[in-house]
């Protein structure tokens, strides 16, 4: 009977929280019933040397990518999680864009939210400011660590060692920001991660200084929507993404007629994603275009073997558009 009474009380409490509550600057913020249950672990960070900033997250929740991570070039990056107030993402970016610091944003967003004790929020601004909030009613184990240029945060974890392990992994990792943030997520999973398990993950990286070409300012945007091993799949996707960065660089070199540079880029791409016929095909085209026809033949053969007859037909069409010049 006592358990039934407790359950009824909890249900009544949740139902009374279902209406919208006043939020920052007079906006409406969702009540608890409207909040996705994205209990999770995440990292927000900025690399001031490379000029990158972003968010990475894993959760036992379907398609966490549209919910938790938010970032805008030249503005900042935000993770909103636990019983998620999704409005923290766009509202927080708007506040940053208006000149507020990361600390100001966290204070303003949580101050106007009646459900703040259930929220977890982390913000990094384009100047390297970092601020985090972990509500007192986030499901244990829950906590965060704010370090130089980053914050790691987690809730509903199996162990309280998750976020310290994330911080350590990020601090010792080397390489691009996306790979360093992924290392932090992997360290969290090694500590047991979410007590419920794992399902989805995402990485979002943008430029810390916006350029006059906004289409080039989102550097990484990868999501694993539903997987038994989302971080394994996310790492695979990140490697494929890096391969295609080199493919894109190769394509640009071809446009400029710089086939030697194209050759280097396509070769690197193939080494990163050797099972995709796209990589050896354009590698072979570049070899042929710099006069290394004999070297191109086995690479063409590999592409044709992987991709089938359509790739042979594609090769036949390239001379007429001057992309195969031999």
Task: Give the label of every model feature segment.
Residues 23-245, 256:
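N-terminal nucleophile
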Residues 269, 302-303:
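Canonical positions in the second alpha-helix
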